[in-house]
């Protein structure tokens, strides 16, 4: 699966501009972490262990936007922690889009549907004829409850608060490390995979761009990842991010102390990474 044309052209334009001005080093992606707090404790994630002393720290909105301006990368990946917990995530996304950035929201999917309900509540009031069929479809597919419908039709609780709306420059980048059984084991909570799938389905009905974000570990079955991508293709997912699961000191210590697991059997080495990713190029051609 190739990058969408709009993204390819935007990034290519940035590369060409930097080359023409003689820049030897420049950023193409800014990884922005507005907070380190998360609502899951995924096995293998070093972030919430590495940043255990800064869980309550929250980066001011102005600093986030200034960081993007100073870096001047065409793409910003908002991660964390769980970025949808960030109190000003809507303002941050809209601020980055106003800077003409490509925005990826790297999320575990648990709060996605709530954010999309907020979007519906704002836009339904202004154009109920357009959005009522979408509400009916979402309800028919059990992606909205009767209570959700009632709240959306009432309109937003705070009309002045921004929302995250569909645009070709913004992607929900949903964390999925395998099919249902595997993913729920890794995130250490049952039902997370199904909630992610519900969120993806809702996002595609509403016209959002969606990508998946997958980490491959030593015990990951490559066939399962291929089946995952085939399944996501049936949902209309627009792209995939796939990366090797290297170890973090904090994650290794947590794995031993809290779970009693051997980190050497979980994280990838260089050789194992080459073996696991040998088929990745064929996936990209689908």
Question: Positions of the model-derived regions?
Answer:
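Conserved alpha-helical substructure of the radical SAM core
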Residues: 2-119, 123-169
């Amino acid at each position: 699966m190739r990058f969408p044309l709009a993204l390819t052209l935007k990034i290519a334009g940035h590369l060409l501009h930097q080359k023409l001005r003689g820049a030897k080093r420049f950023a193409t992606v800014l990884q922005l972490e507005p907070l380190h707090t998360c609502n899951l404790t995924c096995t293998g994630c070093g972030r919430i262990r590495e940043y255990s002393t800064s869980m309550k720290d929250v980066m001011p909105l102005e600093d986030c936007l200034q960081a993007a301006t100073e870096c001047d990368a065409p793409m910003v990946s908002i991660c964390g922690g769980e970025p949808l917990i960030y109190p000003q995530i809507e303002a941050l996304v809209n601020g980055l889009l106003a800077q003409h950035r490509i925005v990826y929201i790297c999320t575990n999917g648990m709060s996605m549907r709530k954010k999309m309900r907020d979007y519906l509540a704002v836009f339904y009031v202004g154009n109920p004829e357009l959005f009522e069929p979408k509400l009916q479809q979402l309800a028919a597919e059990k992606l909205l409850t009767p209570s959700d419908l009632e709240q959306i039709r009432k309109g937003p609780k705070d009309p002045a608060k921004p929302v995250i709306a569909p645009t070709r420059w913004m992607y929900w980048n949903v964390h999925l490390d395998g099919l249902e059984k595997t993913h729920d084991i890794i995130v250490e909570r049952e039902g997370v995979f199904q909630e992610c799938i519900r969120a993806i389905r809702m996002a595609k009905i509403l016209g959002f761009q969606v990508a998946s974000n997958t980490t491959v570990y030593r015990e990951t079955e490559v066939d399962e990842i291929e089946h995952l991508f085939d399944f996501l293709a049936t949902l209309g997912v627009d792209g995939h991010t796939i990366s090797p699961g290297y170890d973090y000191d904090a994650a290794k210590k947590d794995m031993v102390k809290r779970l009693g697991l051997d980190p050497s059997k979980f994280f990838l080495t260089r050789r194992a990474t080459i073996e696991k990713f040998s088929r990745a190029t064929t996936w990209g051609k689908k």
